[in-house]
Amino acid sequence: MRRLAAAVCVLLILATGLSGCGERTGLDPKHPVTLTLWHNFGGTMQTTMDELVDTFNATVGRERGILLSVTSISGSASVQEKLTMIAAGDPGAPEMPDLSVCYPSTAVLLKEKGLLASLDGQFTAEELDAYLPRFVEEGRLSDGQLFVFPFAKSTEVLFVNQTLFNRFSAATGVTLESLSTFEGLSAACLRYYEWTDGLTPDVPGDGQWFYTADSLFNLAQVGMEQLGTTLFDGEALRLDDPAYRRVWDVIARPAVMGGYAVYDGYSSDLSKTGKIICSTGSTAGITFYGDQITYDDNTTEPVEYTVLPFPTFDQGEKIAIQRGNGMVVARSTPEKEEAAALVLKGFTAPEQNMKFVSSTGYLPVTKDAFENSVEAEIAANDNPNIQKLLRTAVKVYEEYNFYIPPVFDRFNALSGGYEEERLSALSGARSRYLELAETMAPEEAYDAAMEGVFEAFVSR
């Protein structure tokens, strides 16, 4: 109750004194404006969003004359598709909402059609300075204006099934600390495959997976940045950069020899069935990890997870990707644009932001929330996975730099093509390796299976 009361107090302060830059416009509680909001949050995230909306409508909305009406659309891709249809003027496209969750790449399309309102005029420099600089920077499009406001921001971390890892560690001496680098992670994959294969000496070649990445493309982007270079040359990929070979090798060797799961799906699905020990993925994925796993024979086992910062390459810089979406405001009347800005301020006020963070796995978006609210939330939250995630989020905030992916029209196609072709190349090499390993030593079989694979991928 104290947390709710504090949040309401902050929102009431917003209602009476928060107007941003410029003069007050014609917001009038006697003649309220209705704003439509699109988001893609489901399950517990939708419940949290509903609470944020209800609190806003009962406080700032009531005081200033704003009624927020929400539409939840299943899946982020569906929201972006509808917004893209609006930008293209497609027949049958829905009406543009007043506010919507949106990625920068989609915002570019809307902005080019004059459909978005710049948010710079709604916030003072002091107000914007309260947010994490890189989060705000990502929302500034090519002309430098702020169009995408930080809201549901995330990064990638390493999720570890601590229960299963402990058995492996006790038997082999592999430590959690060794997973802090991709080289150590790659070696652990090979060691785990070897160890699990040895548990069934009468069934050779049945070693198990240790690790997978939800996005090999994100791993490549961040890995290249950690190594002091970049994956991109304009809108093309710099796969001929010598540093890329290191990015390739840490995944290729365990993917082909065993231990890395070449899997076209979410890593949490493999984790929940005990098929992997660890994975790199979005912090928002924490909501899909519970406190037990269910094996293929339907037996269950209680487990605990550990959340570690995103691994780095040996001697590389501590860099992690900046993920998630922000919110955009439709170009409209001065009243509606001001009202929409008040919604953004209300949703991202530290107390309200922490309420969203505490049940979703997203990151705080303000410095104050990171520096002054996280510890209290850790103490108050009864979900041990969220507690661990927040502790790691603070560590990333203090020690890492955030990498912002570039924005250009072909980015999604480039990302999708990379993922598909990389998985195909690794899967094919794995099949060849298994055949060759029947008559060759492991290293010899690996070299033969990988002959020309890297060169073909780089020159594709």
Residue ranges and their predicted role:
Residues D120-Y131, V174-S178, V203-P204, W209-F210, ...:
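Short, solvent-exposed loop/beta-turn-alpha elements that line the ligand-binding surface or hinge
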Residues G43-L67, V108:
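Short, polar/charged alpha-helical segment
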Residues Q145-F151, E156, E183-A236:
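Extracytoplasmic/periplasmic solute-binding protein
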Residues V101-V157, S186, P201-P204, T300-P311:
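Hinge/lid segment of periplasmic solute-binding proteins
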Residues S186-Y193, D233-D264, Y305, F310:
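Glycine-centered hinge/linker elements that transmit conformational signals in sensory
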Residues A88, R253-V256, D296-A369:
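Extracytoplasmic/periplasmic substrate-recognition and gating elements
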Residues A380, Q387, R391-R460:
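Conserved C-terminal helix/tail region of periplasmic/extracytoplasmic solute-binding proteins
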Residues G61-R134, R167-F168, I277-C278, D296-T299:
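Extracytoplasmic "Venus flytrap"/periplasmic binding protein-like
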